[in-house]
Design a protein with these regions (language model features):
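Histidine-acidic metal/acid-base catalytic patches
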Residues: 2, 11, 16-19, 24, ...
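A short beta-strand-loop structural module common to alpha/beta enzyme folds
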Residues: 26-36
Length: 372
């Protein structure tokens, strides 16, 4: 197991690379989509009408972008584990089944080939129309640390998606006379299937793993659009669409734990590890489930993170694990302090994985569950 750190575009700086090394990370998961303004990484409420930001001017990333990123990261003593998330502008019509779908699919194929050629082994993505939306921000974590959470009763989950917005970002100007977007579960799965059947063979040739993030929040629907992977067993359905090592998972532990009706996630994590399809892992902890949960410090939620490490150890997982987002601590560098706490906790668990003893969960719980 290897420790990584996720950095947003504006946070891909020498100072943050140095911080990552100091905290024990060896790998970087880079977000090239510019979600936020300003230079400081932070949490996002994800609930404003216009979402996180405007990506309408984004140009498709190419080999030079990726090669420059890989060189910069390596020059700073680290390795690239993955890039995370396509800009919504690159695939809005793939998600919405719009008129530029074929053109955008071809663009994604070029992007995947260029990433593989540059030495980027994995691309994380989230096949979602509403995206990460509905959070609130407040002193929800231990010691009143700032964190994010979901209270579905406090928002209107059916608030229509503004025209020109997908994945919680504006990809073009809106039309005032446009009809609200509505998408059923069957329609969304059909779109995902068409996407995977087109791009996974290209990823195989390029030596790239496409790693799917589950829904966050994992509600049944948001903003008139169905959610996709909002139960752990739906990951199996996704992997079965194209049975390939390049059709993998961006395994977010917090999102799995948030899913309603899921008593425990340990058997699911073991099953996914046994299938050998985990691209990388978001090591995040939470308390509660949809419709009401909040994110916690990594040692203070409903997930036994030591048990997760035992399972990964037993199943031979040797990939990258990152903290994902964390609560912010009360100091002059709240983001860095929160990340440092999570990275230190993770490093201690992983360095002592052999001494953690046997797994405490029934290995038979990894029996596969069919999703329909």
């Amino acid at each position: 197991m290897k420790i990584g750190l996720g950095l947003y575009r504006e946070s891909l700086t020498p100072d943050n690379f140095r911080f990552a090394r100091q905290a024990g990370a060896t790998h970087i998961v880079a977000h090239l989509t510019n979600y936020f303004r300003g230079r400081d990484p932070s949490l996002s409420a994800g609930c404003a009408k216009e979402g996180w930001g405007d990506c309408s001017a984004d140009e498709l990333w190419d080999y030079e972008d990726f090669a420059g990123l890989v060189k910069t990261v390596r020059d700073n003593g680290l390795e690239i584990a993955a890039i995370e998330n396509f800009s919504p502008r690159f695939w809005s019509d793939v998600l919405l089944d719009g008129p530029d779908r074929i053109k955008q699919i071809e663009g994604l194929k070029r992007l995947i080939r260029d990433a593989g050629r540059a030495g980027i082994p994995c691309i994380g993505y989230n096949f979602s129309i509403a995206g990460v939306w509905g959070w609130s921000r407040g002193p929800f974590a231990r010691g009143e640390a700032m964190s994010v959470g979901l209270d579905l009763a406090a928002i209107d989950p059916d608030l229509p998606l503004p025209d020109g917005v997908v994945w919680n970002m504006r990809y073009r100007a809106g039309r005032p006379d446009a009809e609200p977007v509505t998408v059923s579960s069957d329609e969304l799965w059909q779109r995902l299937g068409a996407f995977l059947r087109e791009v996974v063979p290209v990823a195989e040739e390029a030596g790239v793993v496409l790693a799917a993030h589950p829904d966050d929040p994992p509600a049944e629907a948001l903003r008139g659009t169905a959610r996709l992977v909002n139960r752990p067993e739906k990951y199996d359905r996704l992997m079965d669409i194209v049975d390939s090592p390049s059709n993998g998972l961006e395994l977010c532990l917090g999102s799995l734990q948030e899913m309603p009706g899921t008593d425990e996630i340990y058997g699911h994590v073991r099953r996914f590890a046994q299938r050998g399809r985990i691209g990388y892992i978001h090591f995040r902890n939470v308390r509660g489930k949809v419709p009401n949960y909040h994110e916690t410090f990594v040692d203070d939620g409903d997930i036994d993170m030591a048990e997760i490490v035992r399972i990964l150890r037993d199943e031979g997982y040797d990939g990258v694990i990152i903290p994902d987002h964390t609560p912010e601590m009360s100091c002059d560098a709240p983001w860095h302090a929160g990340k440092a706490f999570a990275l230190g906790y993770m490093r201690a668990l992983m360095q002592n994985a052999a001494a953690l003893g046997p797994s405490r969960t029934d290995q038979s719980s990894s029996i596969r569950i069919e999703a329909r």
